[in-house]
């Protein structure tokens, strides 16, 4: 108990030292392993995180521990062994040392947050000419790391992306790296930034960036033209494969070819980066072998931008627009109002800014009231937010201190079963999804299991006031 208290005090001081965002992103899974004589041993889930903490924060942690207990002479970081199988998402702990922006102490950071959405401003000119990818979908030069706005919702994904783009031969990799989020939150921007930065590097790697739809078209064309072997050979020799919109990969034969390509690249230690609008285990249309291989890497979810991120995106967009019209002015009050009310995605924020830009050309004095009229179709006020099952799972998992993967796993312990049943109940009451579809989103369960969970929670709510209040709280959190 004394050692637990020591760890709690050190954790609190570490959080105060590095800031809550950095602490949550990188130290959230740090645990006390043991204390023996003069040595404190802390554990983390992955080798990546162990190496990163040892290189950057071990001295600070040791100092904090010794300030709490002068008898401690040494702090060691261990990698704890998993006690149960689960899908390897591990977003917080799966990013290596290149995540410089995420680990800079708050006092050395820019006052403005730097969050990531495709609507951001113009990227800085590259230090060297960017070569073209071998083939594939076109790259947009605006979508570099410099124009990607970073914040708490995408910091881990950005750090992983930078690590891959900057990694040299033999570097530690997250393979495959799987980035998932709803539409308009910056996945495509981030993937293109990886490709652009990698192509710009002195290593001159062989890079292929393409969408799943382009992959299907290219393979179908190659098969039709009896050129499939040539296409496979060209893909075999690449160093970095980046696939966007994986949820659109359809067709048994195409998926079979992609599975072979994926296996070949991963077995050859070539880097693969994939993005989709849902987690790999939720891509029900994919061949099970493809899903399994994608789940074998690191999956990182990007969430929606907060107010500070949205405001920064609008400021950058205004700065970019001023390059064409130096006299352009949109008051900060207007930008703040838009950032506060247009909350769905970066694409909608871009649409809102374009509306302002257009209207300002013949209505130079826009008021808040006029902005509300113009952007009424983009503002969520007064309209119920469309809730996704993924949102429900995330909020419920966080509330009950379990992982989202545990909710969809086969574990039947009490600490998992009750949150799982509550999440199923909320999925039925807050979304239009059917019992079978909800069951599939919860690890492929039968519709009768979902029906039982819904009825069970309904019974408990009627008899348990505390649970009823909990459910109402969860509904509010989900709809925020």
From Swiss-Prot:
Residues 71-137 are annotated as: Domain II. It is found in: Cytoplasm. Residues 138-360 are annotated as: Domain III, AAA+ region. Residues 361-480 are annotated as: Domain IV, binds dsDNA. One of its GO terms (molecular function) is ATP binding. The keyword Phosphoprotein does not apply. ATP binds at residues 184, 186-188. GO terms for biological process: DNA replication initiation; regulation of DNA replication. Keywords: ATP-binding, Cytoplasm, DNA replication, DNA-binding, Lipid-binding, Nucleotide-binding. GO terms for cellular component: cytoplasm; plasma membrane. Residues 1-71 are annotated as: Domain I, interacts with DnaA modulators. Belongs to the DnaA family. Plays an essential role in the initiation and regulation of chromosomal replication. ATP-DnaA binds to the origin of replication (oriC) to initiate formation of the DNA replication initiation complex once per cell cycle. Binds the DnaA box (a 9 base pair repeat at the origin) and separates the double-stranded (ds)DNA. Forms a right-handed helical filament on oriC DNA; dsDNA binds to the exterior of the filament while single-stranded (ss)DNA is stabiized in the filament's interior. Oligomerizes as a right-handed, spiral filament on DNA at oriC. Domain I is involved in oligomerization and binding regulators, domain II is flexibile and of varying length in different bacteria, domain III forms the AAA+ region, while domain IV binds dsDNA. This is Chromosomal replication initiator protein DnaA. The lineage of its organism: Bacteria, Pseudomonadati, Pseudomonadota, Alphaproteobacteria, Hyphomicrobiales. The gene is dnaA.
């Amino acid at each position: 108990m004394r050692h637990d208290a020591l760890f709690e005090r050190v954790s609190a001081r570490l959080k105060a030292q590095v800031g809550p965002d950095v602490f949550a992103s990188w130290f959230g899974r740090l645990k006390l392993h043991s204390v023996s004589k003069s040595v404190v041993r802390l554990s983390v889930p992955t080798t990546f995180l162990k190496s990163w903490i040892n290189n950057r924060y071990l001295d600070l942690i040791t100092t904090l521990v010794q300030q709490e207990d002068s008898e401690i002479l040494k702090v060691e970081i261990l990698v704890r062994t998993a006690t149960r199988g689960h899908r390897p998402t591990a977003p917080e702990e799966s990013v290596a040392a290149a995540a410089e922006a995420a680990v800079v102490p708050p006092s050395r950071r820019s006052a403005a947050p730097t969050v990531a959405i495709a609507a951001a401003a113009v990227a800085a000119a590259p230090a060297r000419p960017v070569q073209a990818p071998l083939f594939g979908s076109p790259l947009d030069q605006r979508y570099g790391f410099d124009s990607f706005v970073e914040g708490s919702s995408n910091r881990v994904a950005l750090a992983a992306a930078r690590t891959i783009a900057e990694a040299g031969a033999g570097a530690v990799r997250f393979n495959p790296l799987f980035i998932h989020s709803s539409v308009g939150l910056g996945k495509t921007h981030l993937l293109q930034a990886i490709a652009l930065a990698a192509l710009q590097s002195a290593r001159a790697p062989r890079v292929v960036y393409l969408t799943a739809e382009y992959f299907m078209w290219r393979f179908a064309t190659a098969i039709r033209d009896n050129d499939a072997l040539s296409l496979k050979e060209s893909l075999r020799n690449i160093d970095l494969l980046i696939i966007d919109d994986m949820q659109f990969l359809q067709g048994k034969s195409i998926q079979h070819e992609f599975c072979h390509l994926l296996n070949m690249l991963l077995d050859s230690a070539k880097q693969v980066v994939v993005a989709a609008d849902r987690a790999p285990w939720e891509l029900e249309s994919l061949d099970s072998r493809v899903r399994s291989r994608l789940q074998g890497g690191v999956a990182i979810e990007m969430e929606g931008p907060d107010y500070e991120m949205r405001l920064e995106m609008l400021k950058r967009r205004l700065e970019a627009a001023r390059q064409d019209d130096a006299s352009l002015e949109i008051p900060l009050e207007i930008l703040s109002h838009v950032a506060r009310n247009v909350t769905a995605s970066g694409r909608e924020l871009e649409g809102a800014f374009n509306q302002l830009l257009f209207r300002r050309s013949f209505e130079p004095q826009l008021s808040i009231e006029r902005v509300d009229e113009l952007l009424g179709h983009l503002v969520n006020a007064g309209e119920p937010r469309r809730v996704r099952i993924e949102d429900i799972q995330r909020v419920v998992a966080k509330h009950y201190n379990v992982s989202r993967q545990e909710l969809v796993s086969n574990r039947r312990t009490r600490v998992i079963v009750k949150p799982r049943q509550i999440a199923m109940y909320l999925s039925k009451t807050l979304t239009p999804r059917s019992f079978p579809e909800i069951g599939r989103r919860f690890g492929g369960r039968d519709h009768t299991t979902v029906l039982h969970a819904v009825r069970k929670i309904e019974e408990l709510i009627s008899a348990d006031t505390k649970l009823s209040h909990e459910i109402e709280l969860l509904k509010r959190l989900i709809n925020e």
